[in-house]
Amino acid sequence: MDFLLWLEQTGLSAWVRESSSLWAYPTILFLHTIGLATVVGVNAGIDLRILGFAPEVPVAPMTRLFPVMWVAFGINALSGTALLIADATTKLTSPVFYVKMIFIALALVDLRLLKTHVFGDPFIDKGPLSPNAKILAVTSLIFWVGAITAGRLMAYIGPVSGVR
């Protein structure tokens, strides 16, 4: 707990938590929201296409969206870290935080498997997608819904945050 208290008292943490600057908490939260919307939105679009929605859209060109998702995830990781250190004693002592992290980790593993096994197939648009591709798409959607739900529940379950 001493480390969490120290982390919460660093200059960056105090600035994120206490600054009246628009560049502090509001901008970081905005970036976190945009990053999340991009990662999950693009990933969900790919998942839905794999599940058979919009069959006229070829799957193979969607591989170009993976770098967009990774950049958005990087923004999310950085902004999430800033939000986390601003309220470390609350968030890092909440079991819901760890549930969220597990769902994110599972979603990222799923995304990697999708990229390797589905988009790695040179005949991806030549026939129906495999049942395994569809399973990866469904589990991806489940993992992202779980991560988002856990993230929202952090505001309502567990220790009460001192942050806005």
Language model: regions and residue ranges:
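Polytopic transmembrane helical bundles with strong interfacial aromatic enrichment
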Residues: 1-164
